[in-house]
């Protein structure tokens, strides 16, 4: 009752922040990992090495990864702003700015898309070569093969990655806990971090359980809707 009555504004704030993050991170990660998978699906020399390089970040502990990105995006002495200064470009507040923290976290999320890339790569290798050759015979180029063969044949793979991306997006926690602590001004107060604060910082276990159930229902409904209209 306390959650939906509006007496706790952080509930709706955390929900909105998480929805915005999911809406930005899922399409970005899907497009980026699909593009990388396409590059690695070509007959490029040393593609096994590049596949390993792109997948390795997924096995790095998130806490260690967060520490590295905090140094890179430090607004005072971070690598990113030093590069911008060297190029005579305006610097950014990155994780310290209300308007820039979510886009920065979306960019950081691309670091962990190696598993999505591997799944896309496996799906691309299952696309029948005969269909691609038939498009070439009919005079079709790269875009014709991509739009009329590759993407339609990979619909189940894309669907799986979208569903998993949404689920993982709503469960984001470590980045907020380690890198921003929900700040600045609660602009990165993600839903699961809000749940954590309710349970372990404020001791409101009843509220935390209700928040967890709402998260379960949101993910279940979104998954059902995607199944329905996919």
Question: PLM features: residue spans?
Answer:
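A structural signal for multi-pass alpha-helical bundles of membrane permease subunits
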Residues: 1-230
């Amino acid at each position: 009752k306390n959650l939906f009555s509006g007496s706790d504004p952080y509930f709706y704030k955390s929900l909105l922040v998480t929805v915005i993050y999911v809406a930005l991170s899922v399409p970005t990660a899907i497009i980026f990992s699909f593009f990388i998978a396409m590059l690695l699906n070509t007959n490029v020399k040393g593609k096994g090495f590049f596949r390993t390089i792109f997948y390795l970040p997924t096995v790095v502990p998130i806490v260690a990864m967060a520490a590295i990105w905090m140094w890179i995006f430090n607004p005072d002495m971070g690598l990113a702003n030093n590069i911008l200064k060297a190029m005579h470009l305006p610097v950014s507040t990155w994780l310290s700015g209300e308007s820039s923290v979510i886009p920065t976290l979306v960019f950081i999320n691309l670091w962990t898309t190696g598993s999505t890339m591997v799944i896309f790569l496996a799906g691309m290798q299952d696309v029948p070569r005969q269909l691609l050759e038939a498009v070439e015979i009919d005079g079709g180029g790269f875009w014709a093969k991509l739009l009329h063969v590759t993407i339609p044949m990979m619909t189940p793979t894309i669907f799986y990655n979208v569903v998993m991306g949404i689920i993982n997006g709503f469960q984001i926690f470590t980045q907020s806990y380690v890198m921003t602590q929900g700040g600045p001004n609660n602009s990165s107060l993600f839903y699961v971090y809000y749940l954590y604060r309710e349970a372990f910082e404020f001791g409101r276990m009843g509220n935390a359980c209700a928040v967890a159930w709402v998260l379960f229902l949101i993910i279940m409904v979104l998954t059902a809707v995607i199944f329905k209209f996919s």
